[in-house]
Amino acid sequence: MINTQIIENLQILLHKEDTTLLEKLSFKENTFSEPLLIAYFNNKKLGTLSSEILTEIMQGFFIEKEPLKIKNSYNQNKIAYIPNIGYYNHNRELVEPILEIEDLEVIKELHPLLNRYLIEFYKGHITNPNPEYRSVWENHIATLKNALTLIKENIPDFFKEFHSANKKIFIHNNPRILNFTSIETLGMLYFYATPYATLMYFVEELIHQGSHNILYHITFDKKDFFKIDAPNTIMRDLTKQKWDYRDIYGAFHGVYTVYKRLECYDILLQKNALEGKDKHELLGRLADQFSRFHTGLELLNLDEVYTEKGKAFYVDLDKKCESIINKYVLLKREFDLSNRDLDFRYEDFCLLNSFEDFLIKDKQGFYNF
C-alpha cells in the first residue's frame, strides 16, 4: 500500500537538503514515512526553516545515536516531541515515552510544525485560523485501543491497509476542529474527542480518516486518474450545484471514504461483532452514509474528468456503494437523522431514535440482514 514514489521523493529532498543527515539515517520503511519529515518540506515552501529542525525531527532514526538536540522542537506547552525518542521539557528531561497501540502512535504533545493545520472550519469557510485546543489522549486511550482491536480482529484486510498508511494520531478537545488528514502531514490522523466519544465514534473515524491517508497513496500520481486538475477544479463550476464548495479531488475522497465505511460496517454486522448501544450506533452511522452518497460526482461527464483508470476506479466504487446501500435500504425509513449537522453524534441520534425501541426490534430479529 505504501507508494514508493513518495519515499523516493523524500529521499531526494533529503539529499538536496542535507547529504550528511541522509547518510546518518536508517533506511527502514518507517524512517521515510515519518509525518513530521513530510510536514517539514511542506512548511519550508512557506518560508525559511532552520535545517536544525530537520535534524531534531530525524535524530530518532539515526543509525548511531548522538547527543540530543531539541532547541527548535518546543511547542506552546514547552514540551519537545522527538519522533522515535520521546517528550522532553525545558530541562531536557524525558517527561513522556512514545506510546503505540496496535502500531499506531498516540501523539501526546503536538510538534510546532503541525500547529498550522488545526483550524476551525465550517461548510467551506475557515471560521478560526488559530483555535485553542489541548491534548486529551489520556481520557480516550482505552476506547481507542478497543476500536483498533475491533477493527483488527473483525476487518483484518482493512486493518492491514490502515496500518500501512496511518502512523500517528493526535486527539484533542475542540469539536470545531473537524477531524481530518492532510497529504502535507501524510500518515497523521487528527481527531477531536468530546466526553461523549464512544467506541463506534473511534471506529468510524479510524475507518473514515484512515481511508483518506490510504487514498493519498493510491492516487499520489493524480495524472493516472484525472484528465483535469482535480484539486483545483471546484465542483459547483461543473455541476452547477451552488452549495458545492468542494474540489473534485476532495469529492472523490468523499466517495472512497463512504465506500470504506459501508464496506466495514457491513462486515461488522454480518459478523455480529457489536450489540446493545454499540450496534444501535453502528446502524445509525450506516444509515448516515446514505445522504453522503451521490452528492455530485455522478453529475459529471466521466470521460472529461477521468482517465480510463480513474473512471474504472470511480464506477467500481459507485456500484459497490449502491449495492451495500440497497442491502440496508430499510434503515433509511427506520431512523430519523434530521438533527444531524456535519458529524453524526450518538447522543443527538438517541434523542430521535429510541434505544429501548431498538432493543425490542433487535430481539425480534428486525435488524438481521
Name the predicted role of every residue range.
Residues M1-I169, G284-F369:
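Type-3 copper protein
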Residues L110, L114-P131, P175-F180, L186, ...:
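Short, flexible helix-coil linker/hinge segments at the edges of structured domains or between repeats
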Residues E161-K168, H172-T181, I234-T307:
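Metalloprotease/metallohydrolase-associated module, dominated by Zn2+-dependent proteases
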Residues I207, S211:
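Short active-site segment of divalent metal-dependent hydrolases/proteases
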Residues N130-I141, Y192-E205, K240-G254:
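Short, charged/polar micro-motifs that form catalytic or ligand-binding hotspots
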Residues S182, Y196-E205, Y216-D244:
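Post-HEXXH active-site segment of zinc metalloproteases
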Residues P131, E184, V255-K260, D362:
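Extended, composition-driven regions rather than compact fold-specific motifs
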Residues K145-L148, H163-Y192, F202-V203:
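Active-site-proximal segments of catalytic enzyme domains
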